[in-house]
Amino acid sequence: MSEQLFPIRVRATAPKPFGNSADLAEVAIGEDGMDYAVKTVHIAASEALCYQIYAACGIAVPHKATLLMIDGSYAFGSRIERGLSDYASCAPTEKSEWLKECSPIISSICALDFLIANEDRHMGNFLFFTGLNGRKSCMALDFSRALLYASWPLPDTWKLHNNTTSTEKGLRQLHFWDSAAATQSLLSAAAIKQSTWANWIDALPTGWITAGFETTLSTWWGSNDFQKRLQDCLSAVK
């Protein structure tokens, strides 16, 4: 664990604007003029590590930063992306089209959610956008109910009733589930080196991970337990 070399200093904070976000502490205005959704302590660690995993697997996520709060503590900041749409704001006639075109990405995200025990991948935890060439795409956000939120060893998320499995089943019912994309995302995660994972953990601010658990978490990636979980996830996403 470490002190942060280049955190973004927070100039002011405001109450969270998203009434249905149980894990969002508040919104911070950084010295860079941007707004950030603030997550603290173990939630901050889960968010930071999951952002690294998903980005390494080619999944778009919002810009992230370590925030130096007004009280001197460190928090995780996910930049609030303007001009993007959540699923609820999509026109009803367009929702199926968005789902179909984004299905490879959504399937990939859900597969990784299984791996890191994210139980809360509902349709409100995607941001949708249109690229320059008119293609539809999406990014993943909110990993508050993943990794360090769950019990340890991690539960078999894909076997349980939760928002993530509901999203997966919904895609399957619509025949939009992309097993090839889901499989590839898991193989991409498997290619992340244990040393890289350990470096990500070591770079977190002191106090974000419970004392004594850092070694357990650091050595988990690539372990026998991890490999078994990976194989179970590969079977689940077929």
Q: What does each model-found stretch correspond to?
A:
Residues 91-93:
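Amphipathic, charge-rich alpha-helical segments that serve as recognition/docking helices
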Residues 83-87, 121-125, 184-190:
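A general structural signal for short secondary-structure boundary/capping elements
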Residues 96-152:
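Conserved kinase catalytic-core segment
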Residues 68-71, 108-111, 168-176:
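Short C-terminal domain-edge/linker segments immediately following a structured domain
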Residues 41, 136-238:
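C-terminal catalytic region of ATP-dependent kinase domains
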Residues 1-89, 113-118:
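Conserved ATP-binding subdomain of kinase catalytic cores across diverse folds
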Residues 62-64, 86-89, 101-105, 152, ...:
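Glycine-rich loops and low-complexity Gly/Arg-rich segments
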